[in-house]
Amino acid sequence: NSIVKSGAFQKMEKQKSDINFFASMTAIPSTYRDQITMGLPTEVKAEDITLIGGLNFEKGKIALKTENYTENEAVKALLKKQMESVGKANNTFVKYFPASTLMFFNVGVKGGELYNLLSENKEFRNTVSIAKADEVKELFSSFNGDISAGLINVTMSSAPTFMMYADVKNGNALEMIYKNKESLGLKRGEDIMQLGKDEYVYKTRGMNIFFGIKDKQMYATNDELLYKNVGKAADKSVKDAPYASDMKGKSLFIAINAEAILDLPIVKMVAGFGGQEAKTYIEPVSYTHL
């Protein structure tokens, strides 16, 4: 059969992008493939899905748009369920992340639908024991809205700094995790401690992760200063970033701030030790997003 007669090729031809392309899911990098097939049963094969995309050269930026295509009816039904587990993000938490955030992730989630989708995945069912099923369902179902996460800083002296916020219905899931910490299989030197109402810290030998609920918003961070300022807007936030307008109406959005990354002391040091050529190639790029 000629490739030009395939449904994927014909759909690609109808696009009005500067560059149109399509590729079998088996041919794209595993990190992107795993993101697309998240939660789908293991019996769904990569070759059942084709990635159709378009590249547009716009003023000051290069825009990439992609979608999944399949002629397998069973896979179509599963992809539909996958789409139903996410909704358009409201960008609720962008004001809490500084504009200098190195990598920003934002997704709109319907927790109950996501749990139902994952329940059809054999690996997920095998991982979650019957005894823990209700607790896991409670945790997933508590998510209802935006989940935003950001890589804030990277240094040589400590673990990369991150921050995460999520819309939740209540704090029941976190309270359940704390009360059942003995069954979590914590290793020596690890513990979960309660700092106050709906405030906890997961302590390890190398890092502390502060997490909790504030105003029906779940948070988690490994930086004590960020923890103490939870719920406070940044002076100049992601809301003011050049890519902020591109987030509107998206269910999933990922941005990488190349300017901020190149400005890191650790990157400047690496450039001084022979990484200048790579820096020269990256420097013209301000940011990239998916």
Predicted regions and their residues:
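Long, low-complexity, Ser/Thr/Gly/Pro-rich intrinsically disordered segments that act as flexible linkers
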Residues: 7-29, 57, 93-96, 100-111, ...
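Short amphipathic alpha-helical linker/capping segments at the junctions of internal repeats
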Residues: 2-13, 81-96, 124-126, 185-186, ...
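Generic detector of short, locally flexible boundary/turn motifs and exposed helical patches
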Residues: 29-34, 67-72, 125-132, 182-188
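A short, polar/proline- and glycine-enriched secondary-structure boundary/capping micro-motif
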Residues: 74-79, 116, 175-176, 230-233
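Intrinsically disordered, low-complexity segments enriched in small/polar residues
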Residues: 37, 51-52, 58-61, 143, ...
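Single conserved position on a long alpha-helix in the C-terminal lobe of the eukaryotic protein kinase
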Residues: 1-6, 145-243
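Short, solvent-exposed secondary-structure boundary motifs
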Residues: 36-47, 81-85, 131-145, 181-188, ...
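Leucine-rich, highly hydrophobic segment in Treponema pallidum outer-membrane-associated proteins
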Residues: 7-103, 256-290
